[in-house]
Amino acid sequence: MGYTIKQKIGICLKAEANPEMTQSDLALWAMKEYNSERPPSQTTISRILNSKNDIISRKESEFELIRRRKRANPLLRRILTEWITQANWEGIPITTPIIQSTANAIWTRLPKEGQEGNGIFNQKWCSHFVKKLNINITGSPRDVLDNRGYNLNKVWKLDEILELKRYLRDIIDQEDYAPQDVFVIDDFQLFYSLPLDQIFDVSSIDKGIKQSNSSAEHSLTIMLGCNIDGSEKLTPIIVGKYDKFDVSKSTHVSLNSMQFDSVSYQTLMNKLTEVYNIFYKSNTNKWITSSMFQNYLTRLDHKLSNSRPNGRKILIILDDCSSHRIINLKFNNIRLCYLKNEANHKNPYNTTYSGIKFDYLPMNFGIVEEFKILYRLQQYLEMINLQRSKSQIDSDPMIEENLTSTSVATTATALEVLSESDYHISLIRAIEWITRSWHSVSSERIFSSWKKTHLFNLLDWPSGNSGQLVYLNQKLNTFDENKSLKKLKEVMSYLNVVIPWEIDELVGLVNERGKVTLSYASIEEIIDSCLSEPVDDYDEMGDDDGRFDNRKNELGDVSSVPVDNSNDPWFTVSEINEFHNDPFYNNDKSIDAAAEPLESISPDNDSSAIPGLETKALSAISGLGTTSTSVVSDSPSGTTQKYNNISTYPNGSLKHKLGVLENWNRKRGPGQGQGQGQELQNPQGQQQQEQQQQQQHQMSGYNFSPISNIESPIASGGLTNPNVQFGNGAGSFDNQTPLFMNSLTSPPPPPPVPVPVPVPVPSVPSQVPATSFPQDVSSSRAVRAPMSTAAVDVDMATAITKLLEYSASNTLKLSQSTIDDLDYNLRVIRARLNQR
């Protein structure tokens, strides 16, 4: 017998709730559950599970279908559905002649391969099409009554805050929502392959100018969601430009061995969802369309029905951008609350657009910013290690001439400035970083963001059950909100660049803050957003007989796949020790000791996202000390510095101009350069660290079990299975160091250091007693004598002259503003040299 869509959904949900069941077990369960004469074949079960993401998102109107007929013009139907959805939300009247005219206009704009028929659509076709859409935006009278007298598509404006707070309190009390049942959803752009050196053309991203095709290719739209206490995070949606892409650089063995061009789109997407617990979609504009969002919520609604005996009901707060305007707001287990986004600009690319969002979405009060900081931190660590691997350890003769016998004999290492192509990040690597960053956002950060909205009285929850919120509120007393920002700022100083980013600009890029889907979308925009998106032609496979095997119900038993860490950038300390055979990486030294002072800022913050990534940053910084004591870059902007104030920069707003020489040279004085790190001996801590590393190596996949928020309902009704490895947020990475050693060649041994003559500034001892701890990260670095002023000027003038020569010969592409800045700096330096 054939199975209906509803029965197939039941099979998929049963498989996800019981991952230990084999396909033969599922077949026997289906026969008993649905009173079949015989169990379905192995081929049938396999096909159902292979299309489970598509099947679970089916609407109720399709529940009784067994086979769905292949329909004509699937692309036109998708575009017309998007247009009708937007028109209904905007209150535009829709009649049959208007639908006929719009359908014909869409048909003429489609590429030839997407056109079917003659482009003429009669009244019967239009009537049947609208009926199948099942439009329900405002809700029935009963739905309005249950919604406290408001339409389902009610959008709450900024000046309705008091009425909104009363509505939320009444709804929570009426439906008995716990804090864990209230979620927020928001989407934003991420330029995942952004060059970290502003000498390259990044003005279109930084200043809000409309991007060119080359820069727009390396951006993604990401949708994130979480509840109030941060205990559950919804599965992210990631939308890119390409439906299939190279996955050979994945750190997961089942992906890096896959030939993406030889597998089907469905197989690749299922594997990405299985490994990273994300939904990847694609279209030309990289938009989350309303159809995507409708399917996402429908899938979530079906899983909520299966999470508890009587289902679980949740409330989702979101803004009213066009992506969230769906055609049917009636769900069995989900209630949507729309907030007006006052930053409703038709053209967010306008240079005067500030990107400030006047709303009450918790995502805009620190969650998205924290996510981007954690992503950029991983990007900087990757580039620092790439730069280190490409740089040659050569001494500058001019520096050697100015070094006296009282100076530290270790010369500076000139780190090679990376090219624009070096900053390219593969899409699969970006997905891994996105997943890691989202899982590393702590519950304290999430709760703090909800608290800042003042939408709820979190300590006096209407339906009770506020014990966890009281606990989180107490932990906020020791929670350092700027900890991740400080760490990113410190790590940024170790990347040698020509024109560095300012941290506020990097985290708050205009085109990342602005939504391109805020207002009503035109037909042309809708067509672009639907092109290249895989089209569902509603063609179901039939039942085939076949023999059973005892394969798992997913694409494969991931837990049994061997782990291949050869391409994993997050190597453990012991592996780096073995690779380098360097005194710095001695096994009897603990790399975590340097992080102790920073971690002591928040001793009770066990689930903070920063300790783990912070330790990796410190490890990377200390690792640089093995080959470098201070960086004399090719330009003064690239000189590594450490600033104690987040908002203070050496040159203020004139970041492209040289600061006062005395101030600039003082920052490069003793104790300010990169020095060889001194570590503490802690054999007991090292032994515990190695044991934890062995446990991590036994894990499968990308060194974590993705938080299966909506994937595996559990008996308690939660959307998330307990995840031991991510129990401490990013602290789970404490015993790993993020040095990318895959393409690194072993560095030559450091030059012998003669016994230095005592100098006024004492140097760091080579061995620190185990009972003493450094008070600051910079205290673990060696001391370097300052360079003479003349030597610095000559070095800078030579470097700037070379840059201008490269630009004149088109070897290096520089913007005109950068060339003007370099000319200005060169004139200042030459004038200063002529005065001596």
UniProtKB/Swiss-Prot annotation:
Give the InterPro entries listed for this entry: CenT-Element_Derived, DDE_SF_endonuclease_dom, Homeodomain-like_sf, HTH_CenpB_DNA-bd_dom
What is one GO cellular-component annotation here? Answer: nucleus
**Domain HTH CENPB-type, which positions?**
64-139
Key words of the record: DNA-binding
Enumerate the residue ranges of region (Disordered).
626-732
Q: Where is the composition biased (Polar residues)?
A: 641-651, 699-711
Any one Gene Ontology molecular-function term assigned to this protein's record: DNA binding
Recorded hits in Pfam families, A to Z, give: DDE_1, HTH_Tnp_Tc5
Gene3D superfamilies cross-referenced by the UniProt entry:
Homeodomain-like
Low complexity bias spans: 626-640, 677-698
User: Which SMART domains does its entry note?
Assistant: CENPB
Listed SUPFAM superfamilies: Homeodomain-like
The role this protein plays is: Essential for the synthesis of pyruvate decarboxylase.
Q: What is this protein called?
A: Protein PDC2
Coding gene? PDC2
